[in-house]
Amino acid sequence: MSQSRDLQGGKAFGLLKAQQEERLEGINKQFLDDPKYSNDEDLPSKLEAFKVKYMEFDLNGNGDIDIMSLKRMLEKLGVPKTHLELKRLIREVSSGSEETFSYSDFLRMMLGKRSAILRMILMYEEKNKEHKRPTGPPAKKAISELP
């Protein structure tokens, strides 16, 4: 990101996200061409969904998700973790750094055998979005129905 303190955000943020999306599309293409993942059914739509989720939490557009982004993601999902648990999770996922993980690491985890944790997180988030609150006044309850 640029060194200047331009706090505007609209157009610059849009350009940053467009560049980030192009970069992630290139990585998706590498995974589509990789014979290791050729047996994975519906791979293009999975990669697209993973790209959207990754972009949602990589707000600064630097290509890596750090501890604070992961913490925000898990808190948003209602599964807060301690700092040590977050470090351990990132260490399991990342191929190099202990403080961040890249989109490639994220895809390897999602498409590999260790994807159960993150798949569960993403599935939980989707279920949370589908649940709509009832509209209108609440139903009347009798005293016998109260706990």
Swiss-Prot record:
Q: In which residues is Ca(2+) 2 bound?
A: E98, T100, D105
- Kindly state which keywords UniProt assigns to this record, in alphabetical order: Acetylation, Actin-binding, Calcium, Cell membrane, Cell projection, Cytoplasm, Cytoskeleton, Membrane, Metal-binding, Phosphoprotein, Repeat
InterPro entries membership: AIF-1_EF_pair, AIF1/AIF1L, EF-hand-dom_pair, EF_hand_dom
**Which parts of the sequence carry N-acetylserine?**
S2
Chief place of localization: cytoplasm
Q: In which tissues is it expressed?
A: Abundantly expressed in the testis, moderately in the spleen and lymph nodes and at low levels in the liver and thymus. Detected in macrophages.
- Segments carrying the region annotation (Disordered) are 128-147
In this protein, which residues make up the domain named EF-hand?
45-80, 81-115
**Any one GO cellular component localisation term in the record:** perinuclear region of cytoplasm
Compartmental location:
Cytoplasm, Cytoskeleton; Cell projection, Ruffle membrane; Cell projection, Phagocytic cup
Molecular function in Gene Ontology: actin filament binding; calcium ion binding
> Which GO BP terms sit in this record?
actin crosslink formation; actin filament bundle assembly; actin filament polymerization; cellular response to oxidative stress; cellular response to type II interferon; inflammatory response; microglial cell activation; negative regulation of smooth muscle cell chemotaxis
Record PANTHER family? ALLOGRAFT INFLAMMATORY FACTOR 1, ALLOGRAFT INFLAMMATORY FACTOR-1
> Its quaternary structure?
Homodimer (Potential). Monomer. Interacts with LCP1.
Q: What's this chain's function? A: Actin-binding protein that enhances membrane ruffling and RAC activation. Enhances the actin-bundling activity of LCP1. Binds calcium. Plays a role in RAC signaling and in phagocytosis. May play a role in macrophage activation and function. Promotes the proliferation of vascular smooth muscle cells and of T-lymphocytes. Enhances lymphocyte migration. Plays a role in vascular inflammation.
The name this protein carries in UniProt is: Allograft inflammatory factor 1
